[in-house]
Amino acid sequence: MTMQQALTSLTDGPELPALIAGAGDRTAWRFVEFFTVNIRNANTRAAYGRAAGDFLRWCEGRGITDLRAIQPVHVAAYIEELQGTRSAPTVKQHLACIRMLFDWLVTGQVMPSNPAHSVRGPRHSVSKGK
């Protein structure tokens, strides 16, 4: 499978987020691999694809032009902003996606460290009825 085929099956289109595309072919391939190798469930893959895309577009909208320039403060600000409009489980899912994606990029040696590692998510507990 070529990167283009993998990307098209992942995103329903041939476009990578600009921060990923601008970081070079190796980073782009690791990004596609993250979704195709790590996530087997199609629904989870789609949700994580949206979450990663939303975060990367959010970064671009704040003037971040280099993937390696993303810092924990950026991830924390994004999560805090999401908490104003999304449910706690959705926010936790976005943070889980961002953490896993950056872990994958660190493992592939395209990122020096994971900027989401130290960011805490919202508290959420499910209570059962009696």
What do these predicted ranges mean?
Residues 1-18, 101:
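N-terminal helical hairpins
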Residues 17-20, 108:
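Short N-terminal helix-initiation segments at or just after the protein's N-terminus
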Residues 19-33:
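Short alpha-helical hairpin
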Residues 29-46, 53-129:
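N-terminal core-binding DNA-recognition domain of tyrosine recombinases/integrases
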